[in-house]
């Protein structure tokens, strides 16, 4: 039997079981847990390679074969870290397993035929597209910026650089909702819009849900009172949509206890739950211990560094229309920025008490850095806290699964779209991102929407090959013409679909329904469901979880920074 040495095998077909891979310049290492490809029967495309007529490619028609196969990919998802071929059919993940030609090979799950395109996944990491569930839709240019970072779904609200949108993630009222649905029709990105949830009577909320939002947003700048919270959640319960909340920093209408009492045990997504992005000062972070609260962070505080505190004050003044010449406005800003709770936030992510990370795009957060800052946080915690049980010094598989869940499956579950997106699982949209390991978390190698290439780094279009400089991120064919709409989905409430909103306003893209948002809780946040009792000292701002003080030093240096961003 012919053999090949480990180094040559990894170079040719990618890593296999027991091999370890470093994630970019971090201290995080993954180890391959399982390999679905068969040694000696691997498929690979190229001159003199396997995927040729009568060899790895069968004679079968498109009815029996996949449209696209990603060969020898290293899948990193919440459910595992495995090596496999991935077959994609009609825009969805059809099979994860072994690809080839069943006429001459045994145990073939994915049949390759003349109608099958190939993407070489050997030596690359494959992840689900990121889901950013805290978007201020301030400018359309955010969409391309997010896409090029590996994000394929954006959930939030807004209408452009309006004063309300600069501060709050709300698309307010049916007319604005319809305009945003129309404006985003032709982008290669999935969308979900949040209506304004701040009112104490139901009618204005019902009409927004029926107009096409996938959820509602309560924001303190519109008045997040106990009455509006109760009303908003009551309407959401009837329509099966999610509610996101930015609570009352100034404690004008009540304290954190009053807000949590107004929840009445109903499910809610708490934005920037640490508090620097807004929320009851100084103890909104206590919400992380509640069984009905789905907590998230936004990326300006991710991770805690020596620069975090200084940069926040100016950001806050701009985003919330505050005046630095008014002492009360300055005091408002100062009350939100607490190094003690930001330090605790790092540790709460590492222990799974905070379930999600999002951007807060152009409203204190950076839309193209959600994924990067997630892995910077994971790396900081590895350096400061060591392996995360059950991990050992050999690999960080559990920590990697915990952190990738924060921007993929958990926001999908929270907003009722996990049946369509959020993980690499059969039946879901093939919204996928390929990464070279050396660039993982910061520079994707390729972004696919429904199995069609939407964006990638590309060299000089007049060159003789694809790679000559200047190489930079460019939209690909999946971002043009009607293909962008036909490979992308907008998530609406079932009520809006029943009202015929897509047809009435001329939407031509795929439409998905958000569902199962009211019967979930913290327990459903994969790898991130710890519910400690959180206590905050009102004088020192120290944070304790189940009696243990949560604190850490700010980072002075981070991975995934300057060495990747010279141009």
Swiss-Prot record:
| Residues that bind Ni(2+) 2 | 217, 246, 272
- Name by which UniProt lists this protein: Urease subunit alpha
What are the UniProt keywords, alphabetically? Cytoplasm, Hydrolase, Metal-binding, Nickel
Q: Pathway it acts in?
A: Nitrogen metabolism; urea degradation; CO(2) and NH(3) from urea (urease route): step 1/1
SUPFAM superfamilies in the record, alphabetically?
Composite domain of metallo-dependent hydrolases (SSF51338), Metallo-dependent hydrolases (SSF51556)
Chain ranges of the Urease domain: 129-567
- What Pfam families does the annotation carry? Amidohydro_1 (PF01979), Urease_alpha (PF00449)
- Which NCBIfam families does the UniProt record give? PRK13206.1 (NF009685), PRK13207.1 (NF009686), urease_alph (TIGR01792)
* Cofactor binding notes: Binds 2 nickel ions per subunit.
The UniProt entry's sequence similarity note says:
Belongs to the metallo-dependent hydrolases superfamily. Urease alpha subunit family.
Q: Which reaction does it catalyse?
A: urea + 2 H2O + H(+) = hydrogencarbonate + 2 NH4(+)
**GO molecular function list:** nickel cation binding; urease activity
Which EC numbers characterise this protein's activity in its record?
3.5.1.5
Q: Report the subcellular localization.
A: Cytoplasm
Q: How is it modified after translation?
A: Carboxylation allows a single lysine to coordinate two nickel ions.
Cofactor(s) recorded for this entry are:
Ni cation
**N6-carboxylysine, modified sites:** 217
List, alphabetically, the InterPro entries matched: Amidohydro-rel, Metal-dep_hydrolase_composite, Metal_Hydrolase, Urease_alpha_N_dom, Urease_alpha_subunit, Urease_AS, Urease_asu, Urease_asu_c
The active site consists of: 320
Ligand binding (Ni(2+) 1)? 134, 136, 217, 360
Q: Which GO terms describe its biological process?
A: urea catabolic process
Q: Does the keyword Cytoplasm apply?
A: yes
Q: Which PANTHER family match?
A: UREASE
